[in-house]
Amino acid sequence: MSEELLVSKIENGTVIDHIPAGRALTVLRILGISGKEGLRVALVMNVESKKLGKKDIVKIEGRELTPEEVNIISAVAPTATINIIRNFAVVKKFKVTPPDVIRGRFKCKNPTCVTNAPREPVEPTFYLVRREPPLFICAYCGRYHELGDLL
Ligand code: CTP
């Protein structure tokens, strides 16, 4: 069944398309969208896709997500396309890509890293050191992390 038969087009907001089948809920969790924000969100799971066989789609009405916000989902949805919708038209389309730097979102896995010390208010920071597959290094202790380890 086509996605159009399941959910209609949105007027303004963001459509995350070409999510690997079955990962839409994980994408929402990573984006921190729980439903409690009051945003209208539509989820389409396991619909036909020419490129992927099957895919998931997330439609968020009334909020334009920035590349910085969505690039983090590249760990679970590297194939995702982000469409910004205004007045029912796609005005921007971009593919997710691993972020060059991630600040403040995730904890370093090294228990002795200064960012994990109880009285050190240091913001965890990770730099991208390899793009394919994405690998990050902690700016403080040098521990390497795959994006999947951080999530
Ligand atoms: N979409 C939507 N509401 C709109 C416009 C588009 O929900 N007002 C959705 C479409 O249903 C589709 C995605 O946004 O899932 C991208 O739309 P579009 O670029 O028109 O589709 P395609 O050309 O098929 O996209 P692509 O080339 O990225 O596969």
UniProtKB/Swiss-Prot annotation:
Cofactor remark from the record: Binds 1 zinc ion per subunit.
Gene Ontology terms for molecular function: metal ion binding
Record's keyword annotation contains GTP-binding: no
Cofactor(s) of this protein: Zn(2+)
Key word Metal-binding present: yes
Alphabetized Pfam families for the sequence: PyrI, PyrI_C
Listed GO CC annotations: aspartate carbamoyltransferase complex
PANTHER family: ASPARTATE CARBAMOYLTRANSFERASE REGULATORY CHAIN
Function comment: Involved in allosteric regulation of aspartate carbamoyltransferase.
Protein name, per record: Aspartate carbamoyltransferase regulatory chain
Organism annotation: Pyrobaculum aerophilum (strain ATCC 51768 / DSM 7523 / JCM 9630 / CIP 104966 / NBRC 100827 / IM2)
GN (gene name): pyrI
